[in-house]
Regions:
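Core beta-strand elements of the Rossmann-like FAD/NAD(P) dinucleotide-binding domain
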Residues: 7-10, 174-183
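Generic hydrophobic/aromatic pocket-lining and core-packing "Φ" positions
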Residues: 24-25, 104, 228
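Conserved N-terminal/central alpha/beta ligand/cofactor-binding core
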Residues: 34, 40-152, 158-161, 197-200, ...
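Aromatic pocket-lining residues of Rossmann-like dinucleotide-binding sites
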Residues: 28
Length: 258
């Protein structure tokens, strides 16, 4: 079957279990490749931070199914500039913005449902398409589709290190187990859950305090940045500002990880 099964060398090894990993696995399987996906979390916590999302911001030049009015490319781009403070890659950003207009058909093909516009909520129904059942339903739909397409999925399988020779992927290690593949997709998330790395990125304030010590992680506990740090050690280029984040106000009594 698909879960926790042994496998011959796959065409594609996908490391991660959230939205990006699932999309990569689904598209590889659609193209006829054999796929093995390694998810660090147990099955009940699968999906990374994608389980905490609820909608997709979509460009559209005219009303589209669950979207009202219009949300053109340039307005979307200007909104992105506001929230990033201008620290973004315009070429890649515009690629994503344009694709947001058409990706819902592919998502529906893999079992994702969108809820109709809510009465009195036109300000978000114009820009955002909401997943029926939220991010957890999105993740579950993709996992069901992946299993139907023959993607092998292993849970509780955190990758500790990669074997990289001359800039090329050779193998991944889950503990002492060595897993080879013809190609590898790294989609294992950032370092949002790594308190030590967050401290390093945010530093100390003028009172000598560490702001990151007060952070509560609205998301998975499994995004430790292990492979990100591994790739940086192997010469991968850094990009972006490590202090950029999507932050929200939550109850101070909330657990460290949600």
């Amino acid at each position: 079957m698909t879960t926790q099964a042994s496998t011959k060398q796959p065409d594609v090894l996908v490391i991660g279990g959230g939205n990006a990993a699932l999309c990569a696995a689904l598209m590889a399987a659609e193209a006829g490749a054999t796929v093995l996906m390694l998810e660090a979390a147990p099955r009940e916590w699968r999906g990374g931070n994608s389980g905490h999302t609820r909608n997709l911001r979509c460009m559209h030049e005219a009303p589209q199914d669950v979207l009202v009015e219009a949300y053109p490319e340039e307005e979307y781009w200007q909104d992105l500039l506001k929230v990033t403070g201008g620290i973004t890659n315009e070429k890649l950003a515009r690629l994503v913005i344009r694709a947001s207009s058409t990706c819902r058909d592919w998502m529906r093909k893999h079992g994702v449902h969108f809820q109709p516009p809510l009465s009195g909520a036109l300000h978000v129904a114009r820009t955002n398409a909401f997943f029926m059942g939220g991010g957890k339903a999105l993740v579950n739909a993709y996992y069901r589709s992946a299993e139907k397409l023959g993607v092998q999925i292993r849970y509780n399988a955190p990758v500790d290190k990669l074997d990289i020779k001359e800039g090329r992927f050779v193998a991944a290690y889950v503990g002492e187990e060595r897993i080879t593949a013809k190609t590898c997709v790294l989609a294992a998330g950032g370092f949002e859950s790594n308190r030590e790395w967050l401290r390093e990125a945010w530093g100390q304030n003028e009172r000598g305090e560490w702001p990151a010590d007060n952070f509560l992680i609205r998301g998975t506990q499994f995004n430790q940045g292990v492979l990100l740090k591994h790739m940086l050690a192997h010469g991968a280029d850094r990009i972006g500002d490590p202090t950029q984040a999507h932050m929200v106000a939550i109850d101070a009594r909330a657990p460290l990880y949600d």
